[in-house]
Regions:
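Helix-coil boundary/capping segments in enzymes
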Residues: 1-209
Length: 209
């Protein structure tokens, strides 16, 4: 299979937060202390289990750590290898799974600042989606307004399944914020896992999800 034409845009690149420690510099004192004192280990979701063969190409997995956590390797394998002009980072961290609205907001901010500093500042071909905490749409709207001034953030990221259908009025503040900042809303496969992902209950196999 030949490479795509030069100038292609990869609309779904998944940089991985290597560990919760990577986000500590981007949390305020309260949440940093909470993570340390409570021994919070990780906030990864189960959307892409590390041991699942289809979560990442075997040859892209490092010997230690997660696929997608290293910019140098990602640059070589996902950008240079395909002649990619731009790539949009969709960071699928566990922000949407948290029950505490304030904690979810703090981690959404941390993830966005981490992406900007550790990825966008270091690779001019990268763009990113704004990670929001839909648990509180007003918080999510505030985060959109905060990050939209950085034009390297090109859309708002939401998961296809949240606590309720995304068309509910509850989420309208998020859509208003996206609209006033001229940003599309990108809906990615995934779930907050509050409810079964099908109308007839939980699936048996990961592929069904």
């Amino acid at each position: 299979m030949s490479n795509p034409p030069v100038g292609a845009i990869d609309c779904d690149l998944h940089p991985a937060v290597p560990s919760i420690k990577a986000l500590l510099p981007y949390l305020d004192d309260h949440w940093r202390d909470m993570v340390i004192q409570r021994g919070v280990h990780e906030l990864d979701s189960i959307s892409y289990p590390e041991n699942a063969p289809i979560s990442a190409r075997p040859d892209w997995k490092p010997e230690v750590g997660k696929a997608g956590q290293d910019l140098v390797r990602l640059r070589k394998e996902a950008l240079d290898g395909f002649g990619t002009k731009f790539a949009i980072c969709n960071c699928l961290y566990g922000v949407q799974l948290l029950y505490t609205e304030d904690m979810a907001y703090a981690f959404a901010r941390a993830v966005n600042d981490w992406i900007a500093t550790e990825w966008l500042d270091k690779e001019p071909r990268l763009r990113a989606s704004i990670v929001v905490s839909p648990q509180n749409p007003d918080y999510a709207a505030a985060e959109i307004d905060r990050m939209a001034v950085d034009k390297r953030f090109v859309q708002v990221l939401m998961l296809v399944m949240d606590e309720m259908p995304l068309g509910r009025r509850r989420y309208w503040p998020i859509y208003r914020a996206a609209e006033r900042n001229g940003l599309p809303v990108g809906i990615h496969a995934g779930s907050a896992y509050r409810h079964p992902v099908t109308s007839v209950g939980w699936p048996t196999y990961y592929a069904e999800d």
